[in-house]
Amino acid sequence: MNLVLMGLPGAGKGTQAQKIVENFPIPHISTGDIFRAAMKNETPMGIEAKKYIDKGELVPDEVTNGIVKERLAQDDTKDGFMLDGFPRNLNQAAALDEMLAESNRHLDAVINIHVEPDVLVERLSGRFICRNCGATYHKLYNAPKVEGTCDVCGHHEFYQRDDDKPETVKNRLDVNIKLNTPLVDYYQKKGVLHEINGEQDIDKVYEDIKKVLTNLN
């Protein structure tokens, strides 16, 4: 079972990835993890990627593609894998098709956890911090027990980090939506896309994903 897991920041992709690998015996291949592993193990592509990362530059597609290809060549992917964070654009999607075709494999499903942008802004911009002790809260998921009073130190002054402010979150989401939309269209045309409603509770989202994956087996 060869999968790609997609979803905008705040859609709950990390939580669902964890649930999938707990219940299906396939490796979770996150691009962040494989970059770190490739650099640590000094693979040819890891050495190449490190040059860009050390300079604070974006890693070119061909290097990212090479690192994914190295990882997909490992034995534990023989019976399937779940890619998370790749592909990020249409060039990478085409490269993935090519590398799978070379080893007589194909994608079985692309799971896209869909959450409306305004809900994502609310989820991602709800965090606030006690100015006195640094305790972190979220207005939806982890509000103080007494409104306006820190549970930890009893102070009443809170602030929000700049990157948690709604306008910053919205800008970050806009960038991701621009990358995501062509990929959703691409996989829809290929007939492998499964849209999952990510606005349900966590267990219900997983139930819907599980139904898709069970039908693939």
From Swiss-Prot:
Catalysed reaction equations from the record: AMP + ATP = 2 ADP
Keywords linked to the UniProt accession: ATP-binding, Cytoplasm, Kinase, Metal-binding, Nucleotide biosynthesis, Nucleotide-binding, Transferase, Zinc
UniProt superkingdom: Bacteria
SUPFAM superfamilies: P-loop containing nucleoside triphosphate hydrolases (SSF52540)
Role played: Catalyzes the reversible transfer of the terminal phosphate group between ATP and AMP. Plays an important role in cellular energy homeostasis and in adenine nucleotide metabolism.
Keyword ATP-binding part of the UniProt annotation: yes
Binding site for AMP: 31, 36, 57-59, 85-88, 92, 161, 172
Name this protein carries in UniProt: Adenylate kinase
Compartment(s) of residence: Cytoplasm
